[in-house]
């Protein structure tokens, strides 16, 4: 790194080398050859990924993707913003989760413009704080990033896409920060009504609330795992 008196992020930026590659295949090969730079436990992989996607999109293009005057890629305490999440999942740094564009008092609000490869579900939608569009809810691959109160995890259907007829299907849940020692599987039954909470406090696991933004009122069972409250 450069000058040791610089803050860590500035030292990293000063030491960066950029590479322009002619195709997606060349980019995949390059990342494969340098995977350790992104995956090393004591490295700067997350920061390198953010720099890479921002420069690939182009800083001016990423800025123009965002709602006027509101967008950044990093928020308070170094948390990623919705713009950064959208940039990672769709290649465009739009500020909202709904599909397409909307106008509010003459201001253009930008949502998901292109179909993403994987989806996203948000607990905030269950609480009425945002709207997630069909492009994120129905991705081509049965994989969904799950956002619950600034924390991100993932659910996926290992057996393929859920049945179009509403039959039961199994989802796997993975949380990198949870130090899981077992596979967490949930069975979702869209055609069966959700049972009332079986504890005295009436608590509903946040993950269930989030999944029901995609499969409303579905019955959800945790199979052999304890529900995460």
What do these predicted regions represent?
Residues 1-229:
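Cysteine-dependent deubiquitinase/ubiquitin-like isopeptidase catalytic cores across multiple families
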């Amino acid at each position: 790194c450069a000058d040791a008196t610089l803050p860590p992020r500035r030292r990293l930026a000063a030491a960066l080398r950029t590479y322009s590659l002619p195709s997606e295949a060349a980019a995949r090969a390059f990342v494969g050859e340098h995977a350790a730079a992104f995956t090393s436990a004591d490295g700067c992989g997350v920061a390198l990924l953010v720099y890479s996607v921002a420069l690939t999109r182009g800083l001016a293009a990423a800025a123009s993707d965002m709602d006027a005057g509101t967008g950044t890629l990093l928020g308070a305490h170094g948390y990623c913003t919705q713009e950064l999440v959208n940039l990672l999942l769709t290649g465009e740094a739009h500020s909202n989760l709904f599909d397409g564009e909307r106008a509010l008092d003459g201001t253009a609000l930008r949502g998901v413009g292109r179909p993403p490869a994987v989806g996203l579900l948000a607990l905030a939608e269950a609480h009425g704080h945002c709207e997630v569009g069909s492009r994120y809810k129905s991705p081509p691959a049965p994989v969904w990033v799950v956002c619950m109160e600034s924390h991100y995890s993932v659910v996926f259907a290992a057996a393929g896409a859920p049945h179009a007829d509403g039959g039961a299907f199994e989802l796997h849940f993975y949380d990198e920060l949870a130090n899981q020692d077992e596979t967490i599987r949930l069975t979702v039954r869209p055609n069966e009504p959700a049972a009332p909470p079986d504890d005295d406090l009436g608590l509903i696991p946040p993950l269930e609330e989030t999944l029901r933004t995609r499969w409303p009122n579905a019955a959800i069972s945790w199979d052999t795992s304890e529900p995460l409250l």
